[in-house]
Design a protein with these regions (language model features):
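Small/polar beta-strand repeat architecture
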Residues: 116-203
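Predominantly extracellular/luminal cell-surface or secreted proteins
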Residues: 13-25, 107-111, 145-149, 163, ...
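Solvent-exposed edge beta-strands and adjacent loop segments
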Residues: 2-84, 202-203, 207-224
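Structured, beta-strand-rich domain cores
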Residues: 63-113
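Generic short beta-strand segments
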Residues: 83-85, 109-111, 145-150, 209-213
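Charged, amphipathic alpha-helical segments and their flanking helix caps
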Residues: 1, 10, 22-37, 91, ...
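Short beta-strand and beta-hairpin "edge-sheet" elements
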Residues: 109-116, 198-239
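Surface-exposed ligand/attachment interfaces on beta-rich extracellular proteins
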Residues: 32-36, 52-71, 87-92, 121-136, ...
Length: 245
């Protein structure tokens, strides 16, 4: 049976202005992971997002038919509404962005993370420490946490999020940051260790120009809303959910 993906639980974030927007081929996740994003709270309506191609039409006299082709692509205008939160840092940033001509990075985080996967593991005391988890299926950069009935080796702390590096079919090491250096373990350990993935939902990144920051009114029983329309000015990068069972 088909799976529905509700909008409920999604969040929208805005970053600081940029001077240049990369070409489509250069839109990669690392451009955005270093950005300090601020959530725009009170999101009431999510606008459309994604490419649409322009239509090229030429009327051919001899055939009596129009020929059509796809032209340039446009990621559209995202027409968002927010309940008014005057002291919200994200709404303040959105309103300030409308007053400029700059492009801003945006992040959409959806609430569709898969269930976490858990397994007992063994950990070597070595440089780097190696975690053994048979057929773990984890990828580099995937997030995991550890728990134990005893003591983890020095270098690892229970409940802290680590990131997979150097994965093989049945083993991997971890780093303190995505793509960081593998952690060396030392000392002694005891008990049974458990690794649990830290799943993330779908994330979309893009650059956009904030075109409006208007207040919408209505009748007496209508709440005032902040209308924040964003002209998407780049390709939209979609990062699929990771870290689930």
């Amino acid at each position: 049976m088909a799976q529905l993906y509700p909008v409920a639980g999604a969040k929208i974030y805005i970053g600081a202005a940029v001077n240049d927007v990369p070409d489509d081929a250069d839109i990669v996740e690392s451009l955005f992971t270093s950005v300090t994003f601020t959530e725009i709270k009170g999101w009431q309506t999510m606008g459309a997002i994604g490419d649409a191609a322009a239509l090229i039409t030429e009327s051919i006299i001899s055939s009596g038919r129009d020929l059509k082709a796809k032209g340039t692509r446009n990621a559209g205008s995202m027409q968002n509404n927010f309940i008014i939160l005057p002291n919200d840092a994200g709404q303040i940033a959105l309103i300030a962005a409308e007053a400029t001509d700059y492009n801003y990075p945006f992040k959409l985080a959806f609430d569709d993370a898969p269930p976490a996967e858990t397994s007992t593991v063994t950990i070597t005391v070595a440089t780097p420490g190696v975690i053994s988890w048979n057929a773990h299926g984890l990828v580099a950069g995937g997030a995991v946490k550890f728990s134990t009935t005893g003591a983890l080796p020095t270098g690892l702390t229970a409940g802290t999020t680590y990131y997979v590096v150097n994965p093989t079919a049945n083993d991997f090491s971890v780093a303190a940051t995505p793509g960081g250096s593998a952690i060396a373990t030392s000392g002694t350990q005891s008990g049974t260790h458990t690794a649990t993935t830290v799943p993330t939902g779908t994330i979309k990144y893009f650059y956009g120009i904030v075109m409006t920051a208007q207040e919408n009114g209505g009748g007496a029983n209508t709440a005032r809303l902040l209308q924040g329309n964003v002209e998407i000015n780049s390709a939209v990068l979609t990062v699929a959910p990771v870290g689930g069972a």
